[in-house]
Amino acid sequence: MQKVVAIVGPTAVGKTSLAIEIAKKLDGEIVSGDSMQIYKEVAIGTAKASREEQAEVKHYLVDAHSVFEDFSVKNFVDEARSAIGEIAGKGKLPIIAGGTGFYVNALLNDMQLGDKEEEAASVDPEWEVFLAANGPQALWEELNKKDPEAAKKIPVANSRRSLRALSVISRTGGLFSKQQAEIKPRYDYLIIGLNSDREAIYQRINQRVDLMMEAGLLEEARFVYEHRAGEHQVLQAIGYKEFFPYFAGEASLETCVMALKTASRRYAKRQLTYFRNKLPVEWYDPLTDPNCANRIAVRIEEWMKEEK
């Protein structure tokens, strides 16, 4: 089974720089595990590796598509798998670096995924009718009756996930939670998580936002705002939608910058929750341990020798 390293963690913890350092130490190349870095029109708000950094180590799935293209998690997995194959074909180590937990999980594990049309087709019309007539709470309660374990992991408000779970139960006669538990690894992977003291992370987030503003984030956000017609994924990205009230004349720039800092801190918290609950992560603190990169490199080298 192909060995793959993933470097994950909350925003602003230093994943990009550490991934580059590890890639240089261990002859690796990097696949972005970020749902927004794929888009070529936006760079500042997505915190991509700089051109200089990308020149040091080859990156895949950065600037690969336009914001005006549909790009689903299934598309991501397909292209990332191709990139991993290309990297491995050179005899190099594939390194996934990014903070979009669901994307990383879907790549590393053989999860059932579909594009928007396939996903819509996978929903049982009977349950769609039930949702329309009774609402999200009643739909979730039906799921809770049939599969309490699945219901525990699905928020009441997330009707799309409740619909999918109920549809799977109806079609297979089995528990959705059991089928989810049977997801099999696609690779032999090691997941390195970066984290530090919460206040230190929050301070780095605030500093990053200030630096992004100096680098031209407002104009990038204006581009997104001016092209907001349609259902482009980038419209929902943290770093852009927070400025929409400013462009609409409904809020001051200072208020929007503060909103971005708050949203980024909340996002960091959600990222950590996902990684802790969904993936087997080995955690390191790059902010307080000056030898962190070396320790991680040694751990990866040890793991590379293990048979599976």
Curated annotation (Swiss-Prot):
Q: Which UniProt keywords apply?
A: ATP-binding, Magnesium, Nucleotide-binding, Transferase, tRNA processing
Top-level EC class: transferase
Q: Does the keyword Iron belong to this entry?
A: no
Q: Where does ATP bind?
A: 9-16
Q: Identify the residues that bind substrate.
A: 11-16
Q: Its Enzyme Commission number?
A: 2.5.1.75
Site feature (Interaction with substrate tRNA) residues: 100
For the region Interaction with substrate tRNA, what residue ranges are annotated? Answer: 34-37
Give an example GO molecular function: ATP binding
Question: Required cofactors, per record?
Answer: Mg(2+)
Instruction: List the catalytic activities from the record.
Output: adenosine(37) in tRNA + dimethylallyl diphosphate = N(6)-dimethylallyladenosine(37) in tRNA + diphosphate
InterPro entries xrefs = Dimethylallyltransferase (IPR039657), IPT (IPR018022), P-loop_NTPase (IPR027417)
Which segment of the chain is annotated as a signal peptide? none
Which GO terms are recorded in the biological process aspect for this UniProt protein?
A: tRNA modification
Q: Which family does it belong to?
A: Belongs to the IPP transferase family.
Q: What does this protein do?
A: Catalyzes the transfer of a dimethylallyl group onto the adenine at position 37 in tRNAs that read codons beginning with uridine, leading to the formation of N6-(dimethylallyl)adenosine (i(6)A).
Q: How does it assemble?
A: Monomer.
Q: This protein is called what?
A: tRNA dimethylallyltransferase
Name the species this protein comes from: Lactobacillus delbrueckii subsp. bulgaricus (strain ATCC BAA-365 / Lb-18)
Instruction: Name the gene for this chain.
Output: miaA
